[in-house]
Curated annotation (Swiss-Prot):
This is Pup--protein ligase. It comes from Streptomyces scabiei (strain 87.22). InterPro entries: Pup_ligase, Pup_ligase/deamidase. It holds the Pfam family Pup_ligase. The active site is at 57 (proton acceptor).
Length: 453
């Protein structure tokens, strides 16, 4: 599939610190956060003018699902626009708390674990063709996804009985199955719940829930871009070496606990391979595939260059070569500089604070944004485009139809209901349009519905 629909869903961690007054529960903090949303949307589960969905997920986690995008750079821009929308809600919630005499600071973290050991996710969505064996797709993808954390982990200081260790991935400790239909209880690598949000005879939605949430724009580009290339190879029938893992769940933890990428994991064939070797296999296949197909576009070029350079840098133990582009490396360097300056062990509480503060989405507080201001975080997005993305949907996918419908209905003060595939005016006629094709950004039926308001 040379043109694919992508979507990202990020759940955010919420906390609030209070200066000497009563503490609010996470539920109460979430209510303050969503008060503005509920006041106009009459719900804490809404679709926005940019085509995205914003809602309060299980356990008081705000979740932002990007609109459908058909290119990876636009997807990253819309994910960042979601961050900005939530940052706006955070500032508004703090103001309301202060007006009510509660001196508190609200924090939203784009990470995947809290101090109590709970995990919340970043879910990636890839539209794939319905024909073809899903089990073959999963078999080839799982070794790639287990070792992909070397490219796009967010990094974590893990407290163990033997002291704290720095790991590549936050999510790795919380994955318990390879393929399953659950998302919370057993947490698989690939979720098989079949909700394509599209024509079910033609498409299915690959739902990957193993990845970390990313602060870095370049890490996000690499995560989704490399996965897209692997999917394209599978769809084209590219012959791949059998890299099936003997125990993917053990392997994912082993890979996460080794920042050198050299630790061997057992394959089902009885052989052993390191995460670097597994990734190198997929990378070299991808380079060959792109050359043969003549699809070296700007984005594909960017993805392949960073993918190869990341593997080279880890192999050479020269992390400075990717020190402004890969989340886990950026955070690791930040922590190591701080530890060296203050002569601290990895177990020191200040180190845990840095680990968390990297993911603070408040641009004046968060450590990722401090790096960005200092020119130590490479960017691919444009701030103006991110700002536009808060209210303007992608123009080449179904998100445009949804966004335009919502905008018009709100301007005309009409009551409406939408989801990923339905647009409905709640009037006497109950007019509804079903939009099954996520690639379609122009539709006469929707234009008629909008014109009739």
């Amino acid at each position: 599939m040379d043109r694919r629909i992508f979507g990202l869903e990020n759940e955010y961690g919420v906390t609030c610190t209070f200066r000497g007054q009563r503490r609010l529960s996470p539920d109460e903090v979430a209510r303050y956060l969503f008060r503005r949303v509920v006041s106009w949307g009459r719900s804490s589960n809404v679709f926005l003018r940019n085509g995205a969905r914003l809602y309060l997920d299980v356990g008081s986690h705000p979740e932002y699902a990007t609109p459908e995008c058909d290119n990876v750079t636009e997807l990253v821009t819309h994910d960042k626009a979601g961050e900005r929308i939530l940052e706006g809600l955070l500032v508004d919630a703090e103001r309301r708390l202060h007006e009510e005499g509660i001196a508190g600071d609200v924090y939203l973290f784009k990470n995947n674990t809290d101090s109590a050991g709970n995990s919340y996710g970043c879910h990636e969505n890839y539209l794939v063709a319905r024909h073809g064996e899903f089990s073959r797709l999963a078999d080839i993808l799982i070794p790639f996804l287990v070792t992909r954390q070397l490219l796009c982990g967010a990094g974590k200081v893990l407290q163990t009985p033997r002291g704290a260790v720095y790991c590549v991935s936050q999510r790795a400790e919380h994955i318990w199955e390879g393929v399953s239909s659950a998302t919370t209880r057993s947490r698989p690598i690939i979720n098989t719940r079949d909700e394509p949000h599209a024509d079910a005879e033609r498409y299915r939605r690959l739902h990957v829930i193993v990845g970390d949430s990313n602060m870095s724009e370049t890490t996000m580009l690499l995560k989704v871009g490399a996965t897209d290339l692997v999917l394209r190879m599978i769809e084209a029938g590219t012959v791949m070496r059998d890299l099936t893992l003997e125990n993917p769940i053990r392997a994912i933890r082993e890979v996460s606990h080794d920042i050198t990428g050299r630790r061997k994991v057992r394959l089902a064939s009885g052989r052993e391979a390191s995460a670097l070797e597994v990734q190198r296999e997929y990378y070299e296949k991808a380079v060959d595939f792109v050359e043969r197909r003549g699809i070296r576009t700007g984005t594909v070029e960017q993805v392949l260059e960073l993918w190869g350079r990341t593997l080279d840098a880890i192999e050479a133990e020269d992390l400075d070569r990717i020190g402004t582009e890969i989340d886990w490396v950026m955070k690791y360097k930040l922590i190591e500089r701080y530890r060296a300056k203050h002569n601290m062990t990895m177990s020191h509480p200040r180190v845990a604070q840095i680990d968390l503060a990297y993911h603070d989405i408040h641009r004046r507080r968060g450590l990722y944004y401090l790096l960005e201001r200092k020119g130590q975080a490479t960017r691919i997005c444009n701030d103006l485009k991110i700002f536009e993305g808060k209210s303007v949907p992608p123009q080449t996918t179904r998100a445009r139809l949804r966004g335009d419908f919502i905008r018009r209905a709100q301007e005309q003060r009409r009551d409406f209901t939408v989801d990923w595939v339905h647009l409905k005016l709640n009037d006497q006629a109950q007019r509804t349009v079903l939009c099954k094709d996520p690639f379609r950004s122009v539709d006469d039926r929707v234009e008629k519905l909008i014109a009739g308001m």
